[in-house]
Amino acid sequence: MTVSLIISTYNWPRALYLCLDSVMQQTAMPTEILIADDGSGISTRDVVRHFEAVSPVPIRHIWHEDKGFRLAMIRNKAIAASRCEYIIQIDGDLILQRH
């Protein structure tokens, strides 16, 4: 079974950092992590790059230009980019309980 974890985010790099840090603490990891970014700036990109370097699973940054609130569109792009059988979607301001 393969699983994509899709994390939606927009211009809150500190929250995304904490969210990804909680993902890294899990004992059961997804096959891949997709960051569905609704047009965030460089600080968010830097957080994603940091975790790309330390993650035991691939992380891909799915981004589009900020043209207003287009969360559904960026989530759909991330779903289309998934390479897995199953998808779990969470928001980038969640901290996962350790499992």
Outline where the language-model segments fall.
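Cell-envelope/extracellular polymer assembly enzymes that use nucleotide-activated donors
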Residues: T2-S4, E32
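Short beta-strand/turn micro-motifs composed of small residues
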Residues: I7-T9, D37
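Short, well-formed alpha-helical segments that are part of the catalytic scaffolds
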Residues: W12-Q25
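Acidic donor-binding segment of Leloir-type glycosyltransferases
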Residues: M24-W63
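Active-site acidic Asp-centered loop
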Residues: D38, I90-G92
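Acidic donor-binding/catalytic loop of UDP-sugar-dependent glycosyltransferases
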Residues: S43, L94-H99
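Glycine-rich, basic loop-to-helix element that forms the pyrophosphate-binding segment
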Residues: E65-S82
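Short aromatic/hydrophobic "clamp" motif used to bind/position activated sugar donors
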Residues: I87
